[in-house]
Amino acid sequence: MSGNFLEIKNMKKTFGELEVIKDISLSVKEGEVVSVIGPSGSGKSTLLRCATMLEKMDGGELSYLGERAAYEENGKCVYVSKADRKRIHKYFGLVFQNFNLFPHYSVLKNIIDAPMTVAGISRKEAEERAEKLLAQLGLSEKRAAYPYQLSGGQQQRVSIARALALQPKILFFDEPTSALDPELTGEVLKVIRQLAQEHMTMIIVTHEMQFARELSDRIIFMEQGVICQEGTPEELFNSPNARVREFIGRVMNV
């Protein structure tokens, strides 16, 4: 692995009086799979939203592939120009827990829209890219379907295909199975496993403890807006920290 694909330094985020992210620093290397675990309200999703610039940080630095997206100046968090942010956006994709597909678009249109509007590629190239992804994810026969005609697992696979269509360097997953019935969870986890085998760099917020243990190079435990512990799966699952052990044990026994 070479260099850091993602670098976060001293990230801070508040909503009103509530300090949600408290001085978090995190780096992710090429090909690394990092899972983020922790109780609800610990700041996991906000961390992802700030890292992907859906939310603006109140302090800290953010860079992708050595390219600065935000930095601190005179005590304030300053973002690079809109044009630079748009270019940096091409480095990453985000898969939401509630799919976020356009309901009035077909599966194919959902996938080709961003490559054409964001990356500026031709419709022909976008469709070729989409067809390849649909075949890879077992959805070729659903290309003309609309989201309401799909199961939750199929919708989430389409949202993964949509994120991959921009050919990102990093994929973020925000609890990708939390909106799915248990029997549909496996088909989405299978896709993420396949991406890990292809050395896709991924940051995954998840409550699937066994999955995180099997797949991750590193696991981060967050609580109350801070990283309480990070390390290999074995280090986390055999943690000397009683709170980490309690959380993992409780979630795995649900």
What residues fall within each predicted segment?
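ABC ATPase "signature
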Residues: 230-231
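Conserved ABC transporter NBD signature motif
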Residues: 60-74
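Catalytic Walker B motif of ABC-type/P-loop ATPase nucleotide-binding domains
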Residues: 171-174
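Conserved ABC ATPase signature
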Residues: 146-150, 154
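A short, proline-enriched helix->beta-strand linker immediately N-terminal to the Walker B motif
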Residues: 165-169
